[in-house]
Amino acid sequence: MPVQVKICGINRPDALAAAVAGGARYVGLVFYERSPRHVAPELAAELARQVPTGVRVVGLFVDPDALMLERVLGSVPLDLIQLHGEETPERVAAVRAAHGIEVMKAVKVAGAADLDRAAAYEGACDRLLFDAKAPKGVAALPGGNGLSFDWTLLAGRTWARPWMLSGGLNAGNLAEAVRATGATAVDVSSGVEDRPGHKDPALVAGFLACAAAL
């Protein structure tokens, strides 16, 4: 089964074009102002309109309130909401019920206990995403930090929802990450950038080529 790829943090047409041309299944737009990948709703709407049928548009939010979700969803055609903050299972379920759009919940992983806690979200969301938890005392964004976690923690685990692997992925470690975890879907952001927030179309193409070869 081919590995599906999400290119997250798209904020320019050339990065979007590279993602689509390379076979990305998902493209992510970040609605978190502290991120260097943040896009305003107006630009996000313009980019989303360029996405062809068959590629799903994901909106990444960090602890959004109802007003923010309504403002973005009112202008940007999203296929999936990604919640990447400290949202509780109850909040995730409420967002899912309110908007009628698939919801993917990011779970930050440092150890096995974090994966155990992920089970609480299985009834609240449509998909899970496993990302690396930043070490204590390290100033980091909620995602896109280029950090990975111990992939063997996922080996042999089964989930009631489809899931995606994220955290520190790049063309050089993708094959090992998929082998170690059994992931059938992966999410990359900083691993296809030449500087924070700037996707390199050549790196995007290279990552997608590696995924296609698995």
From Swiss-Prot:
Alphabetical keyword list: Amino-acid biosynthesis, Aromatic amino acid biosynthesis, Isomerase, Tryptophan biosynthesis
Alphabetical list of Pfam families matching this protein: PRAI
HAMAP family: PRAI
EC number(s) reported in the record: 5.3.1.24
Coiled-coil positions: none
Pathway: Amino-acid biosynthesis; L-tryptophan biosynthesis; L-tryptophan from chorismate: step 3/5
GO biological process, one term: L-tryptophan biosynthetic process
Any one GO molecular-function label of the UniProt entry: phosphoribosylanthranilate isomerase activity
Species in which this protein is naturally found: Rhodospirillum centenum (strain ATCC 51521 / SW)
InterPro entries named in the record: Aldolase_TIM (IPR013785), PRAI_dom (IPR001240), RibuloseP-bd_barrel (IPR011060), TrpF_fam (IPR044643)
Protein name: N-(5'-phosphoribosyl)anthranilate isomerase
Enzyme class: isomerase
Catalysed reactions, as listed in the record: N-(5-phospho-beta-D-ribosyl)anthranilate = 1-(2-carboxyphenylamino)-1-deoxy-D-ribulose 5-phosphate
Keyword Zinc applies: no
Family to which the UniProt record says this protein belongs: Belongs to the TrpF family.
